[in-house]
C-alpha cells in the first residue's frame, strides 16, 4: 500500500506528505485522479511477500513472464529477502541471493533491478557520497551487478534547502 501510494504521488508529481496529512491543495486533486487512472492501466504488478526467497521469486517471475510478458523485475530491497538455510553468516546469505538474482535475470532474459541498503560507513565520510564499498552486508553485490547506480541527495545532510528534491546519480 505504501509503495502504491509512492508510485501514485510520483506519477502525479504530488508531495506524498500532503496526501498523508490530508493537506493536499485542491488544485492538485485533479493530478492525483489522472495519475490513478493512468496507473490502473499500467502493467505493474506489486508483490510484498515478506522475506521472500529466491525460489519463490523465481516461480512468480516465471509465471508473470509467461502470462503477462513482464519486461523487468524490481526487488525492494535485497536485504529483505530470505536466503537459503545453512549458510554461515548474513554476508554469505546476501551473496547467494545476489548471485541467484543474476542467474534469474539470465534465465528469464529480463532485467532484475535489486535495490540495496547502504552501510553506515557512508555517514562517517565528509562528502557522504556513496561508494561500492558502502553496499550493505556483501561485496558480492558489486561483483554480481552489471551496473551499480547510487542516488546522492546532498540536501539530506545539509541545512540549506536550495537543492531540496534534487539528486545526483553516481554510476
Segments predicted by a language model, with ranges:
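Short, basic, glycine/proline-bearing loop/turn elements
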Residues: 42-49, 87, 118-126
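Conserved nucleotide-binding/hydrolysis micro-motifs of P-loop NTPases
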Residues: 1-2, 9, 13, 50-53, ...
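Charged, alpha-helix-enriched surfaces in structured cytosolic catalytic cores
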Residues: 2, 23-27, 34, 41, ...
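Phosphate-binding/switch region of NTP-binding enzymes
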Residues: 92-171
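Cytosolic-facing regulatory segments adjacent to core modules
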Residues: 1-69, 83
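Conserved P-loop NTPase nucleotide-binding/switch module
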Residues: 4-15, 78-102, 125-128
Amino acid at each position: 500500500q505504501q509503495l502504491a501510494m509512492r508510485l501514485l504521488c510520483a506519477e502525479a508529481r504530488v508531495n506524498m506528505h500532503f496526501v498523508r496529512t490530508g493537506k493536499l491543495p485542491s488544485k492538485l486533486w485533479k493530478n492525483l485522479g489522472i495519475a490513478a487512472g493512468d496507473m490502473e492501466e499500467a502493467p505493474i504488478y506489486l508483490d510484498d511477500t515478506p522475506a521472500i526467497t529466491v525460489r519463490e521469486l523465481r516461480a512468480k517471475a516465471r509465471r508473470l513472464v509467461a502470462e503477462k510478458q513482464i519486461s523487468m523485475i524490481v526487488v525492494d530491497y535485497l536485504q529483505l529477502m530470505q536466503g537459503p538455510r545453512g549458510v554461515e553468516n548474513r554476508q554469505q546469505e546476501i551473496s547467494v541471493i545476489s548471485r541467484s538474482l543474476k542467474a534469474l535475470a539470465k534465465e528469464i532474459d529480463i532485467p532484475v533491478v535489486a535495490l540495496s541498503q547502504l552501510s553506515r560507513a557512508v555517514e562517517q565520510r565528509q562528502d557522504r557520497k556513496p561508494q561500492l564499498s558502502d553496499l550493505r552486508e556483501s561485496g558480492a553485490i558489486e561483483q554480481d551487478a552489471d551496473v551499480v547506480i547510487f542516488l546522492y541527495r546532498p540536501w539530506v545532510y545539509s541545512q540549506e534547502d536550495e537543492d531540496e528534491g534534487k539528486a545526483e546519480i553516481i554510476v
